[in-house]
Amino acid sequence: GEFPAFGDSQTRAIGTPDEGKTSWAVGDELLLEMTSKTLGTKYAAFKYNGSSWELASGELSYKEDEVPTFPHVYYAPNYKWETGKLVLKEGKVAGTDEYIEGKAEITPNGQGITVKFSGATRNYSRLRIATMPNMQITVSINRYIPAGSSKKIGLRNYALTSDEKGNAYLYGTFENNSEV
């Protein structure tokens, strides 16, 4: 969204709905975990090329006569699969992008995977900071749990870069008396 968001005539207040990401962009990734009764658990990343999803890393395999399950599917741009665990990509910092879990299932013909985020909800806050476009800023934060983590962070500085509309974001859970 732009600032002010969605054509509002004034700055938004706490509690104003923010729909967040509403469409896929080239380069977006989905992280899937698939379990096959015969072949076990496999992990893969799929990347959006503008019209379809392509396997970027990992593998998903199962026997023709079984229906695999997908215990987890994530849209978490800062993360990657590493030996069956989600870990931060090099140079990425927890809490500076989304971490949303969706649902997935194999299509009836076994030729595709249907991924849904329609029932997904953020279990964290998204704090938008309005500044100048494409500007680096430093934000100090205290008593905060970044999205995708269970570790509470004490006083820490975050280096953020605003987008072309002047928005920078933090994603996480803010405790009572958190400071930004």
Task: Give short role names for the model-derived ranges.
Residues 1-180:
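Sec-type signal peptide cleavage vicinity
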